[in-house]
A protein has these predicted regions:
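Conserved glycine-rich cofactor-binding loop
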Residues: 5, 12-13
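Conserved glycine-rich Rossmann-like NAD(P)H-binding loop of the short-chain dehydrogenase/reductase
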Residues: 26-43
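The beta1-alpha1 cofactor-binding region of Rossmann-like NAD(H)/NADP(H)-dependent oxidoreductases
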Residues: 37, 57-68, 100
Length: 257
């Protein structure tokens, strides 16, 4: 990774910070993005390698801010080899009761924000002769999760557009990798499944660490994979849902309060 430049959105904590650390540990220069500049800077110091890392404020819902950080990254490092779309938010509610504005805001960050970042960085990658775009999605983008259905919908959409973009950008030597983690032991994940009537019980999911997701992401990048599902034990669940959705729905129903 020496000489490579990696940009990570939503990098102030959790998966984003862990991904930034893994790539930096392998020799890459890393730009950490977060809506809160001070939190991005704090994460940068936790990541280390401060001589080749940069922290910038960026709200992925704002195309002007995305274009600004693309320009600054090119100014400081002359290139962008990898862009990681990790920024995301979640809401916990039933489809019948959710507020439409909250649902729209969810899509603005989780889906439209990722698409805007892709569109902003592709020209630089084309000019450089290639690159990699990594979308941090979710197993919930394969198997809808009750009372997290709006979140699942954003990840279904992200999975589809990432895999479609992969086909479209192959001729430009740009690989698009989709990473689908299961339940993760992060602040974000604990909020998503916090105890509440109608939510999936947190004790029913042990969860994996952000560091494990980051390592799987790096390996997927290194091998130019199309998709990574982590942990591997979720792969049979995804395949089973495709073949026998009723059986998976029965099992999920038993986990709902």
């Amino acid at each position: 990774m020496d000489g490579k430049v990696v940009v990570v959105t939503g990098a102030s904590m959790g998966i984003g910070e862990a991904i930034a650390m893994v790539f930096a540990d392998h020799g890459a220069s890393v730009v950490l993005l977060s809506r809160d500049a001070s939190r991005a800077e704090a994460a940068r110091h936790r990541v280390g390698h401060t001589e080749r890392t940069l922290a910038l404020a960026c709200d992925v819902r704002n195309r002007e801010e995305i274009d600004r950080v693309v320009g600054l990254t090119l100014h400081y490092f002359d290139r962008i080899d990898v862009w990681v779309n990790n920024a995301g938010v979640g809401i916990r509610d039933s489809v019948a009761d959710m507020e439409m504005q909250a649902c729209r805001e969810l899509f603005e960050t989780n889906f439209f924000g990722a698409v805007a970042c892709l569109q902003a960085v592709v020209p630089a990658m084309r000019q450089a002769g290639g690159g990699t775009i990594i979308n941090i999605s979710s197993v919930a983008g394969h198997v809808p999760v009750p009372f997290m259905t709006p979140y699942s919908a954003t990840k279904f959409a992200l999975n589809a557009i990432g895999k479609g973009a992969r086909l479209e950008l192959k001729r430009d030597n740009i690989n698009v990798l989709t990473v689908c983690p299961g339940y993760i032991q992060t602040e974000f994940g604990s909020h998503m499944v916090a105890a509440k009537r109608g939510n999936v019980r947190p004790q029913s999911m042990k969860g994996i660490t952000a560091e494990r997701v980051a390592r799987a992401t790096y390996e997927g990048y290194r091998k130019r994979k199309r998709e990574v599902i982590v942990p591997w034990t979720m792969i049979p669940v995804v395949k089973l849902y495709q073949l026998l959705p009723g059986l998976v729905e029965w099992g999920m129903g038993r986990a709902i309060k």
